[in-house]
């Protein structure tokens, strides 16, 4: 994932910064506990495509 792109992408719902999880190939919004997938190098920033993170799943930087 391009670091410059990561600097400008925010959560489409709350506008919070996103964390990049390389192993899962996801962008994480801590505030909304959503994981947005990255497919073929393209972040899919749609709420319907995001995975809800369970409360027990730790979100770390």
From Swiss-Prot:
Gene3D superfamilies given in the database record: 2.20.25.10
GO cellular component entries: cytosol
A Pfam family recorded for this sequence: Trm112p
InterPro entries tied to this protein: Trm112-like
Family note: Belongs to the UPF0434 family.
Protein name, per record: UPF0434 protein Nmul_A1027
Top-level taxon of origin: Bacteria
């Amino acid at each position: 994932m391009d670091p410059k792109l990561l600097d400008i992408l925010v959560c489409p719902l709350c506008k919070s910064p996103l964390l990049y999880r390389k192993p899962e190939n996801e962008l994480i919004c801590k505030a909304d506990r959503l994981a947005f997938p990255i497919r073929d190098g393209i972040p899919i920033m749609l709420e319907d495509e995001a995975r809800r993170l369970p409360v027990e799943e730790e979100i770390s930087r």
